[in-house]
């Protein structure tokens, strides 16, 4: 072998050894950084499609959501989640030509509003995030520790005066996962060129990042279901049922 070729080969081997040594020593290599994950912000926004419809003369009342959350979810995250849901739900209805009023509770709706309103929309349910759930995958020799959601949200369309339910549906927000720790790297280097297995553990201990990722996905899932239920075809059916209920009073 020529001297130039030998130098290139030895240089490549030394570079590989330096790379694996860097992993073992915990240096901030690019691959490690990517596995740790980038920062995550709360993003409670869903793109609302469709043109602005003319006013249809109907009033819809929104009741502030009542979502119970476990202690893992910060209260300000929960409040922001609920606030964004009401705001975007109001935007969807207004774009479809409805007027919208908002109250904290059904009991606060004045009698004249009850008589005038077509529907009352109220949302309740629960949401929790479970921490440090361990799962193994023997096929890939990888162990993962995850945070995972649990919960179910309900949306009820109610006739204002009688409070009879016109329509209801639920959204399952459970089993949304975010990985916080994994065993994923193997190297073969024992100081020379004799292979030896070494497992390298990369850990992401930022539960706050995982909570944000899970809640962002849950919000998107809820809004997808809500926009489907508020389609023109569905709303016309709710209007018909609610009007018939008012006549039977």
Language model regions located:
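Surface-exposed short loop/turn segments
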Residues: 111-182
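A structural "domain/chain start" motif
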Residues: 20-97, 200, 204, 208, ...
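Repeat-unit-sized solenoid/scaffold elements
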Residues: 128-140, 146-154, 188-209, 232-249
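Short beta-strand and adjacent turn/loop elements
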Residues: 60-72, 122-128, 132, 136, ...
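Short, solvent-exposed, polar/charged sequence segments at loop or secondary-structure edges
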Residues: 74-141
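Short secondary-structure boundary motifs at beta->alpha junctions and helix caps
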Residues: 142-146, 159-224
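Bacterial N-terminal signal peptides that target proteins for export
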Residues: 1-9
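Bacterial N-terminal signal peptides
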Residues: 9-17
